[in-house]
């Protein structure tokens, strides 16, 4: 596979994770995942930024996006997503069910990763909204890749490309969210 195809495939694979992570901001609000509980260090377990509504809605949104990508692959559009993964997911037949599964794993993996990142930021005494370079950009990526690797084989090259691309996409998406007043900070 040439490098441009690998970059395209890597980005295409991660679309459910990227969109789930962004949609949690849009659909979020309500009850925090930690229910307001504090940890042994007298700081919030996760904080108000990670909510049940954002996590559930964002994760389901990732699953729907995966299903849509599967539907597109059924008609030959975006088949890169499934040229490699279809042979890996042998217990499900059809692009749409496989897409739903991959989207579910990527979407919820991204949001669990974001919650883990918030937990780590609280333990390191960073306030909500304060930047922690690389952790902010990669928490959701690493966990979503761990989740999806249970059904999809990922090459080292793909993982490196996904990490590099994700850093820049995350920064760009945050700047855009700041410009349209969805975020209070540009990072």
Curated annotation (Swiss-Prot):
Pathway annotation: Membrane lipid metabolism; glycerophospholipid metabolism
GO MF: CDP-2,3-bis-(O-geranylgeranyl)-sn-glycerol synthase activity
Transmembrane regions listed in the UniProt entry: 7-27, 58-78, 100-120, 137-156, 167-187
Single Gene Ontology BP annotation: glycerophospholipid biosynthetic process
Requisite cofactors: Mg(2+)
Domain of life assignment: Archaea
Root EC class: transferase
Reactions mediated catalytically: 2,3-bis-O-(geranylgeranyl)-sn-glycerol 1-phosphate + CTP + H(+) = CDP-2,3-bis-O-(geranylgeranyl)-sn-glycerol + diphosphate
Keyword tRNA-binding among record annotations: no
GO cellular component: plasma membrane
The EC number(s) this enzyme carries: 2.7.7.67
Keywords assigned by UniProt, alphabetized: Cell membrane, Lipid biosynthesis, Lipid metabolism, Magnesium, Membrane, Phospholipid biosynthesis, Phospholipid metabolism, Transferase, Transmembrane, Transmembrane helix
Protein's UniProt keywords contain ATP-binding: no
Cellular compartment(s): Cell membrane
Pfam families assigned to the protein according to its UniProt record, in alphabetical order: CarS-like
Membrane disposition: Multi-pass membrane protein
Protein purpose: Catalyzes the formation of CDP-2,3-bis-(O-geranylgeranyl)-sn-glycerol (CDP-archaeol) from 2,3-bis-(O-geranylgeranyl)-sn-glycerol 1-phosphate (DGGGP) and CTP. This reaction is the third ether-bond-formation step in the biosynthesis of archaeal membrane lipids.
PANTHER family in UniProt: CDP-ARCHAEOL SYNTHASE
Sequence similarity: Belongs to the CDP-archaeol synthase family.
Protein name per UniProt: CDP-archaeol synthase
Organism: Methanosphaera stadtmanae (strain ATCC 43021 / DSM 3091 / JCM 11832 / MCB-3)
Lineage: Archaea, Methanobacteriati, Methanobacteriota, Methanomada group, Methanobacteria
């Amino acid at each position: 596979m040439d490098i441009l195809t690998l970059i395209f495939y890597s980005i295409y694979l991660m679309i459910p994770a990227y969109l789930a992570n962004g949609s949690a901001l849009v659909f979020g609000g309500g009850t925090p995942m930690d229910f307001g509980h504090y940890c042994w260090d007298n700081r919030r377990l996760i904080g108000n930024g990670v909510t049940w509504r954002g996590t559930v809605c964002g994760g389901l949104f990732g699953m729907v996006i995966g299903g849509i990508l599967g539907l597109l692959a059924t008609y030959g559009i975006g088949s890169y997503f499934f040229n490699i993964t279809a042979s890996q997911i042998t217990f499900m037949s059809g692009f749409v069910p496989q897409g739903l599964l991959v989207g579910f794993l990527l979407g919820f993996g991204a949001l669990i990763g974001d919650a883990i990142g918030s937990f780590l930021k609280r333990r390191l005494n960073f306030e909500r909204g304060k930047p922690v370079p690389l952790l902010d950009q990669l928490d959701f990526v690493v966990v979503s890749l761990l989740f999806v690797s249970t059904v999809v084989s990922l090459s080292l090259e793909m993982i490196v490309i996904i990490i590099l691309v994700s850093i820049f996409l995350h920064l760009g998406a945050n700047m855009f969210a700041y410009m349209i007043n969805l975020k209070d900070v540009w990072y």
